């Protein structure tokens, strides 16, 4: 009986919270401040299957999963559930990346093989990504597109380093059927005996073409970083490869940046309302401020009619699995709040992409010898020994007495963040409250922080490898806080019914 009561109480509180959000939302295109939104986050392939005909399994899926294809949900299914999401009170939907992917587990979209095209496995004959955007806008809802600037997958990138030809008509579960190596005899770079190599050597041969790991200058345009030493807790996280399926792009090379801007700019032109930028903490703030943020905002301004004239919103993931402080391990420049600010001094930046064509770069090449990266290194040196007390502060999230005041965003970078310090503290509301009260001044405007309890990556600490499972009462308290405190509330799909609580978070 107590369990039944608690579940009913949770459902009631959830309805109250979501209903409150629904009442506050006008569901018209004229919402001019993204802080009026509430976000529902879905992994599109795992949400709802609207077209069984496009279902596909991942190459590395075990036989036990064959009845549950990883690529099952699609744009058509998401459209079918837009009214459900709207009825919950959410005004915006954050969808995982939609570009073509290639890896053993690529259903999540973070292992790009072609940034310029939408992956066919999301689409149906009568439904494209444009259809999804249009259907959301018809309902007064907004689409936030997850994008990746930091890396590609490890199967090359069609327009930067073509390594395979993809046959979308073949069985996508069979890598040998759908992926034909682009070998030297055909004008490519992979070895002619590629298919005879063991998997580890195949991986090494692919990686060498992107990172010059065999001491040969394959990546002569330097589209990727070639740095090899990685540490989560220093600036090497900006240039090194964070995982085997995440090959680090040289975002400081204007040619790489311009290609990404052109590809993702096409989605702005289609009418997406904002970007969630993956792995932003693995890109220097200076690179965002010099390259990506101003360019995306320029395109968004030019095509604002596709969004009904409303501002374009961007927020990024600066992962900080750390409790008790908004400053990550005493390093302000690796902390989420750092990315919300413009630069406080001028740094040189070379916008000539041909500069990189003249450089042979290998793992041991000095970072300080490379334009733009040298400036990022200088920015790190200028801030790495500073404490939080030396950082700029803001009262933008605060009232002055009982009076509203217009926020001063003159030093805002134009990039907001996922509130990792709050996210990681949601096992205990007191911790969340104290973290915000003590740390909000370090953000340019903490009211723009996107706040969630758990996600496809992590739950709150210390059990961050599983979906939130601290009980219905704690969920209710968390929801109450998210929808009434500062910041933009975001709910990971299914949390409204405690879906998969305690389950291990997908590691694909």
What name fits each language-model region?
Residues 133, 137, 151, 262-269, ...:
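Active-site-proximal helices and loops of the catalytic beta/alpha 8
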Residues 2-12:
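Bacterial N-terminal signal peptides that target proteins for export
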Residues 72-84, 253-269, 475-479:
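Short, acidic/polar
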Residues 11-21:
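Bacterial N-terminal signal peptides
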Residues 62-76, 111-124, 242-257, 273-283, ...:
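The substrate-binding groove and active-site-proximal loops of carbohydrate-active enzymes
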Residues 25-145, 150-161, 167-172, 176-177, ...:
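N-terminal structural segment of carbohydrate-active enzymes
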Residues 38-43, 92-97, 114-117, 142-146, ...:
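Structural recognition of the beta-strand scaffold that forms the well-ordered cores
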Residues 36, 153-251, 351-412, 442-444, ...:
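Active-site region of glycoside hydrolase catalytic domains
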């Amino acid at each position: 009986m107590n369990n039944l009561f608690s579940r009913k109480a949770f459902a009631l509180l959830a309805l109250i919270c979501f209903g409150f959000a629904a009442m506050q939302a006008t569901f018209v295109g004229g919402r001019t401040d993204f802080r009026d939104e509430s976000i529902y986050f879905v992994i599109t392939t795992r949400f709802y299957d609207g077209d069984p005909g496009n279902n596909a399994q991942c190459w590395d899926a075990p036989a036990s999963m064959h009845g549950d294809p990883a690529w099952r949900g699609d744009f058509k299914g998401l459209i079918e559930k837009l009214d459900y999401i709207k009825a919950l009170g959410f005004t915006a939907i954050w969808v995982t990346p939609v570009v073509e992917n290639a890896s053993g587990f690529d259903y999540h979209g973070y292992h790009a093989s072609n940034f310029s095209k939408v992956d066919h496995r999301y689409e149906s004959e009568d439904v494209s990504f444009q259809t999804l955007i249009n259907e959301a806008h018809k309902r007064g809802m907004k689409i936030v597109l997850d994008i990746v600037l930091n890396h590609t997958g490890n199967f090359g990138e069609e327009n930067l380093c073509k390594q395979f030809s993809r046959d979308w008509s073949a069985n996508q579960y069979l890598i040998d059927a759908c992926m034909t190596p682009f070998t030297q005899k055909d004008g490519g770079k992979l070895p002619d005996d590629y298919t005879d190599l063991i998997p580890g050597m195949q991986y090494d041969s692919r990686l060498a073409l992107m990172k010059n790991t065999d001491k040969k200058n394959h990546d002569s345009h330097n589209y990727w970083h070639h740095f090899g030493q990685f540490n989560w807790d220093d600036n090497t996280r900006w240039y090194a490869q964070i995982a085997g399926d995440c090959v680090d792009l040289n975002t400081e090379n204007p040619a790489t940046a311009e290609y990404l801007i052109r590809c993702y700019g096409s989605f702005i032109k289609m009418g997406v309302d904002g970007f969630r930028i993956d792995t932003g903490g693995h890109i220097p703030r200076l690179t965002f401020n010099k390259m990506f943020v101003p360019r995306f905002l320029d395109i968004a301004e030019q095509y604002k009619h596709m969004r009904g004239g409303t501002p374009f919103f961007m927020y990024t993931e600066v992962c900080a699995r750390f409790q008790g402080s908004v400053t990550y391990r005493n390093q302000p420049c690796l902390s989420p709040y750092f990315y919300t600010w413009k630069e406080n001094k001028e740094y040189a930046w070379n916008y000539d992409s041909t500069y990189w064509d003249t450089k042979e770069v290998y793992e041991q090449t000095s970072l300080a010898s490379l334009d733009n990266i040298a400036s990022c290194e200088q920015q790190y040196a200028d801030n790495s020994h500073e404490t939080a007390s030396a950082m700029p502060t803001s009262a933008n999230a605060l009232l002055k007495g009982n009076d509203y005041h217009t926020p001063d965003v003159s030093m805002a970078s134009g990039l907001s963040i996922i509130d990792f310090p709050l996210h990681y503290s949601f096992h205990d509301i007191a911790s969340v409250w104290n973290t915000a009260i003590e740390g909000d001044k370090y953000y340019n405007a903490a009211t723009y922080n996107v706040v969630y309890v758990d996600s496809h990556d992590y739950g709150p600490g210390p059990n961050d490898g599983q979906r939130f499972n601290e009980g219905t009462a704690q969920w209710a308290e968390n929801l109450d806080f998210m929808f009434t405190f500062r910041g933009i509330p975001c709910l990971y799909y299914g949390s409204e019914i405690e879906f998969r609580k305690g389950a291990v978070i997908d590691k694909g």
